[in-house]
């Protein structure tokens, strides 16, 4: 594991262990930025800052930087009353990809906060297969049913279970290609 990733993973653990997670605004851009700063402050000079450059990954171009601020306002206003609405908001935020780096790890924590606040559930990420998840995310801008079906299968009401939280954080980093054994 690269040192930046290791430090960021430690920061993610600390976000929960310190109780700082409870001070984060749920479902807002400000909350998303707060999580990003917590994970990446001192690691990236752009921690918590909305990107001003266009980015792409695997041939997919994320929202154009020129319109990003307007898009983020619209996403923040999206409803969060049901599982479907919450996942739709998550998909739109993924398409926006507001940061230069660290979007996935940040947004999965953000998603769980929204699910916890509105549905009293979180995703038990340790059981969500990496390739199925990444495939569903890749297809989600066109059709998010695959993602909704996959994540709904692993919802749990055990929202304060430390093992579920920390295994989920590790799985989130694994999705991005980081493994503890890489040290």
Model-derived features: where do they sit?
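FIC/Doc superfamily catalytic core
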Residues: 1-183
